[in-house]
Curated annotation (Swiss-Prot):
<dbReference type="InterPro" id="IPR027462">
    <property type="entry name" value="ZapD_C"/>
</dbReference>
<dbReference type="InterPro" id="IPR009777">
    <property type="entry name" value="ZapD"/>
</dbReference>
<dbReference type="InterPro" id="IPR036268">
    <property type="entry name" value="ZapD_sf"/>
</dbReference>
<protein>
    <recommendedName>
        <fullName>Cell division protein ZapD</fullName>
    </recommendedName>
</protein>
<dbReference type="GO" id="GO:0043093">
    <property type="term" value="P:FtsZ-dependent cytokinesis"/>
</dbReference>
<dbReference type="GO" id="GO:0000917">
    <property type="term" value="P:division septum assembly"/>
</dbReference>
<dbReference type="GO" id="GO:0032153">
    <property type="term" value="C:cell division site"/>
</dbReference>
<keyword id="KW-0963">Cytoplasm</keyword>
<keyword id="KW-0132">Cell division</keyword>
<comment type="subunit">
    <text>Interacts with FtsZ.</text>
</comment>
<comment type="similarity">
    <text>Belongs to the ZapD family.</text>
</comment>
<dbReference type="Pfam" id="PF07072">
    <property type="entry name" value="ZapD"/>
</dbReference>
<keyword id="KW-0131">Cell cycle</keyword>
<keyword id="KW-0717">Septation</keyword>
<comment type="function">
    <text>Cell division factor that enhances FtsZ-ring assembly. Directly interacts with FtsZ and promotes bundling of FtsZ protofilaments, with a reduction in FtsZ GTPase activity.</text>
</comment>
<dbReference type="GO" id="GO:0005737">
    <property type="term" value="C:cytoplasm"/>
</dbReference>
Length: 251
């Protein structure tokens, strides 16, 4: 199954972007190849840019406080697994404490490193990171892989508390919805949202369905158009009916 997610607020959009960047950074940093570490460093710069949003830190702290209050009220509920609940509450406390102790904006440790900022400046220029542009970077790429991995991990470590908070909030958000089986006649699906106020819409398709959903939504209406996918496929709406799962997620 393939999940397609559509955020309905800038806050959730930012969290999804960060989640994607964190996963991409890990994938590149775990490699031993120099070019993978080049990609990891570029991803690190993106992480810092997205995480530097002025209200991100305060938003996450407030959301963690809110979720802790909601979940704490479930203690003693016979329908809730107490061990799982306590694990989530402990994770919320750890992420909250870690974020609260972060000085200034997330990613400031990168901005204060002159070497990294010189690399970042050249990275903004197409083809601007050749060895004659940045000989010190060329030297770094030729250091032992273990040394580069250690430095990448050190540069990524200050994002740990933000990453944990993002994972908790998105995990709770995704778990808040119940999938509904739906059908898009001739590739189109439309639905009034009525009293729903989703923060995230998830569309789930079977792997073999050669279509992707194009989603548009506001607080009143949801429209999904399934279009042909694949490299070289003619762009257009599917003519057949599409079976899919639809999930509305709200915290």
């Amino acid at each position: 199954m393939i999940h397609y997610e559509y955020p309905l607020s800038e806050r959730i959009r930012t969290l999804l972007r960060l989640e994607d960047l964190f996963e991409r950074f890990d994938a590149h940093a775990m490699s031993s190849a120099a070019q993978a570490h080049h990609a990891a460093l570029l991803t690190l710069f993106e992480m810092a840019e997205v995480a530097a949003r002025a209200d991100l830190k305060s938003d996450l702290l407030q959301e963690l406080d809110r979720q802790k209050a909601v979940l704490t009220a479930l203690r003693g509920n016979p329908h809730v697994q107490s061990a799982t609940l306590e694990q989530v509450l402990a994770a919320i406390d750890a992420a909250h404490d870690g974020m609260y102790q972060l000085p200034g904006k997330v990613g400031n440790h990168l901005r204060e490193d002159d070497w990294l900022m010189a690399v970042k400046q050249r990275a903004a220029i197409p083809g601007g990171m050749c060895e004659f542009d940045l000989p010190s970077y060329h030297y770094w790429l030729h250091q032992p892989a273990e040394q580069r991995v250690g430095q990448l991990q050190a540069w990524g470590a200050p994002f740990a508390s933000i990453r944990a908070a993002v994972g908790i909030v998105l995990g709770l958000l995704r778990d808040s919805g119940q999938p509904e089986s739906q059908e898009a006649a001739k590739g189109h699906y439309q639905r009034m949202l009525e009293s729903r106020n989703p923060q995230l819409i998830r569309v789930t398709l079977a792997d073999h369905v050669p279509c992707v959903p194009e989603i548009s939504a506001n607080k009143y209406m949801l429209n999904i158009r399934f279009v042909h996918a694949g490299v070289g496929a003619p762009r257009g709406c599917a003519s057949e009916s599409i079976q899919f799962e639809l999930t509305f997620c709200t915290l």
